[in-house]
Amino acid sequence: MCQNIFQKIIKGIIPSKIIYQDKEITAFHDINPIAPIHILVVPNLLIKSLNEINENNKHILGNMLYISIKIAKKFKIDKNGYRLIINCNQHGRQEIQHLHLHLLGGKKLNKI
């Protein structure tokens, strides 16, 4: 079975700066950061996009958000603020077909 880059990072096949991992969620530094702090929070289970969330796996979104808050506090960006982004499919500019959340912070971010 062909694995995407996130699956390889989750399984330790590709080295990465993993900052959090449990049985459901893995978080690691983005290799092409667009902010001083740019962390990807991904489910360990392959969910290709936000559109694949359903009754059976919807709890994963809550876990992704909760872990993001914990990471923001760990990196001390919770007070000044941070941004969470989920891109969905081609027009949403999702590049890897594995649901992931971008945690951005460490400076005042541009308006969107």
Swiss-Prot record:
Protein name in UniProt: Uncharacterized HIT-like protein bbp_327
Domain of life: Bacteria
CDD domains from the UniProt entry: PKCI_related
Domain HIT: 5-112
InterPro entries in the record: Histidine_triad_CS (IPR019808), Histidine_triad_HIT (IPR001310), HIT-like (IPR011146), HIT-like_sf (IPR036265)
MF term (GO), any: catalytic activity
Motif placement: Histidine triad motif: 98-102
